[in-house]
Amino acid sequence: YGQFAYRINGGYMFHSVPCYEMKKDSLETEEFNKLGESASLGCVRLTVRDAKWICDNCPEGTTTLIYDDTSTPGPLGKPDTIKLPIGHEWSGWDPTDPDKNNPWLTSSARIEAENITTKIGVPVDVFKNVKAYDTCGNDITSKMTWYGKYTFDVAGTYYVTFKVTDAIGSKAEKQIKITITDPD
């Protein structure tokens, strides 16, 4: 069972990742985690959100141009993918499914970071305890960006802001305060 399908040509289709049963919470998790890889006999598997968009916005007969070149992924590039944690109580749901019963809709990208206090001339690793996670709880710290100015040479209060966007578009932002104090 697949929630959304759109015929490209002949037996080839765009379709959402299949479910084991005709229930939205019975997603084939292992197959979902293959999104972005060759995993089909010619069809193009998509998240529910993307397959639904095609069905809602592309009338029958819409011309389809498929890029099959790893060195040139086309004008939009190859999208990033999110992985579902195997065995998680919500792993039967596609995290992009807009169904109000989808438990992933209560989750989002998040950043964990704490304020820092140190003395003049005692540098600390501002990024040591900063972690970013996607909607499904996967570590995406490497995708995080930051901005702000600080120095360990002048007493004062400084702010650094961390931002991240996960593969399904969920965003998180966290600001920390860095307090530099005079030596005792």
Predicted features and spans:
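Exported/periplasmic cell-wall-interacting domains
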Residues: 1-107
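Residue-level "contact hotspot" at macromolecular interaction interfaces
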Residues: 57, 117, 151-152
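Well-ordered beta-strand positions in beta-sheet-rich domains
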Residues: 63, 115, 173-177
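Solvent-exposed, low-complexity, repeat-rich "mucin-like" stalks and linkers
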Residues: 106-138
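Serine/threonine-rich, repeat-prone extracellular segments and beta-strand-based repeat modules
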Residues: 138-180
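Low-complexity, Pro/Ser/Thr- and charge-rich linker/hinge segments at domain boundaries
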Residues: 183-184
